[in-house]
């Protein structure tokens, strides 16, 4: 445990961030690869309806991520702050209650999703060509595998919060690699032709089950020397701690939920322009995840460090960690913008051979890539406020980003410029959000500095 404390308290900022962030980045990249692998393998069929169906289901899958954020981010941020404040027993109670609440919520979500499967698909814009494919994917990925996926992500966040970033990264990475291996086996060898979407979905489900099993084994192995545990025998956490879980977790979940709603609207609007446009848009939104997943990995490594030092009242180290994470994320995002704009046609061709989809996808990617640095800055700021327990600010920034800017701008640009307007929406909306975010950041920082001086 002393070694873990040195990472939080003593190591040079870049070294601490590297130790915490690199495993998270690797796991995020492998997660990205297996998500892209689904699209790539399905794209080998040259069937835009299959590709479009997977894109349609993505918002529901993201809803499950919002559940994992609710308890993984909310509980994880609080655990790191409790450890920084030397309250180990309370941190242990928070860990246990976070696990049980996430399990109950995940089971309820999977059941509701299956119960209202058809209305949900209609809401997402499914048509006669995509509905059956989307239903197959939804059943296995969310209906059966969703609980295991949520629990894996929650456990990953929680064990990272106590310094076990490497173990968290290995678990998520292992699941991703397994998914990539299972995809072609199930899609092209086990399941018959025409059921490639089902094969991809079953591969994802199985990898989620095995990943969850890994995390259970890890928790059993390290629980004696940490605050990790699922037993409620020591009692429930204080009422203030439960409120704190939700005060950070709800904004973290709502942030994903609002992004999900905006994505549903974008998909539905894009579907009006045809399956080819939707398939091209789906490929682009997968490809843009490379810099964003790296950025998310940086932020995941940043959160425990900032939360711990915030509670320990080491504001200078906290500020250095935040600045270091921001510089790294923006640099990577800018490099990806250059790469995507230069090789857009080759990138889209890698996923699908349909000429019309390639043409649209190339134009979409060249436009959409410019939003990447601004997207990173948006969620980097939200992660920062989650880390210091300022959930209300995170919530309102999420509302500003999606409700005030993204959705209205999307509707306006779609009405005026069609599919291309939808693609440019993210850049305009997130540039506006970044300006608002930094005004809020400097206001909060100045206010806290003034309070400290008094």
Regions found by a protein language model. Give the residues of each.
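N-terminal transmembrane alpha-helices
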Residues: 8-40, 44-45, 59-74, 78, ...
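Transmembrane helical elements of multi-pass membrane transporters/channels
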Residues: 19-38, 175, 207-211, 215, ...
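Helix-terminus/linker motif at the lipid-water interface of multi-pass membrane proteins
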Residues: 33-51, 121-128, 185-195, 257-290, ...
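Short runs within selected transmembrane alpha-helices of multi-pass transporters and secretion channels
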Residues: 72, 141-160, 168-179, 200-216, ...
